[in-house]
């Protein structure tokens, strides 16, 4: 939870920068995804709010940046990449590719995280709702992100195809590097957090 807090406590925000930088079907698809991320306009249903609830249910500080000193650079690189893509209009294709890959690959891990919390005796909605919501929402977002967002962007602006692929591959590479870092640390009986965690 601490490792992912830098991402999930502001999850949708960098992608919102792309809304005015897209047009047509791709823009509509991104707005549809973002509307879900922001809870359909209801703060208690915002995904960042749900993640904060999960953190608090586990006794963690849910304020943004509370653990940034414990999060390794390989995990922060994902957050920085999203922000960089979102802040530069010329990288809008890369941001779309990053988001599409994230949505395509998040349902199964979120199901596992939720089930893991339940196995640990944390079968309380405030602990698992974020993960359960992502299983449901991202199952829908998969098709929207792949076809309506990335597919439409490439159809309408073929010159951005390489950027979309770059964004997806960058997300995949950083996810892989983060996973390798964690497995290596855990295999030696160490925390994935810097300074051994709290």
Residue ranges: model-predicted function:
Residues 1-198:
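Non-heme di-metal
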């Amino acid at each position: 939870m601490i490792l992912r807090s830098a991402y999930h406590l502001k999850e949708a925000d960098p992608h919102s920068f792309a809304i005015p930088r897209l047009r047509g079907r791709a823009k509509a698809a991104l707005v549809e995804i973002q509307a879900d991320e922001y809870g359909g306009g209801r703060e208690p249903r915002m995904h960042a709010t749900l993640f904060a609830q999960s953190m608090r249910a586990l006794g963690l500080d849910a304020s943004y940046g509370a653990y940034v000193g414990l999060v390794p650079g390989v995990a922060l690189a994902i957050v920085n990449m999203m922000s960089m893509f979102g802040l530069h209009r010329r990288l809008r294709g890369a941001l779309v590719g990053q988001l599409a890959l994230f949505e395509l690959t998040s349902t199964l891990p979120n199901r596992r995280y939720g089930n893991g919390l339940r196995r640990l005796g944390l079968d309380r909605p405030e602990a698992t709702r974020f993960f359960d919501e992502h299983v449901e929402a991202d199952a829908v977002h998969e098709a929207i992100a792949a076809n309506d967002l990335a597919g439409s962007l490439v159809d309408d602006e073929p010159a951005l195809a390489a950027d979309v692929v770059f964004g997806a591959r960058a997300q995949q590479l950083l996810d892989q590097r983060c996973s390798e870092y964690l497995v290596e640390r855990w295999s030696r009986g160490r925390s994935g957090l810097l300074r051994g965690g709290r």
